[in-house]
Amino acid sequence: MAHKKGVGSSKNGRDSKAKRLGVKRYAGQFVTAGSILVRQRGTKFHPGNNVGIGGDDTLFAKIDGYVVFERKGKNKKQVSVYPQNVAI
């Protein structure tokens, strides 16, 4: 019994679909509660004020407000959402 497939066959030719990761709402943008801010693998961006983190590390807004990207320590970044009446 032959264990080699004949000519004209390749073991390549597969790829995974793009996962559409990245920042979805930018600094200064108004968002509503539940809006997805960042889709990511791991915590490239950490959750800040009024931002929650999902099981797949997605960051989402907990309140209506404006998006702000901030530094957290020396080399970490965080995303916060502040209500309209708070000065940034």
Swiss-Prot record:
Recorded GO MF terms: structural constituent of ribosome
GO biological process: translation
Keywords recorded for this protein, A-Z: Ribonucleoprotein, Ribosomal protein
Record SUPFAM superfamilies: Ribosomal L27 protein-like
Domain of life: Bacteria
This protein's GO CC annotations: cytosolic large ribosomal subunit
Family: Belongs to the bacterial ribosomal protein bL27 family.
Protein name: Large ribosomal subunit protein bL27
Native organism: Carboxydothermus hydrogenoformans (strain ATCC BAA-161 / DSM 6008 / Z-2901)
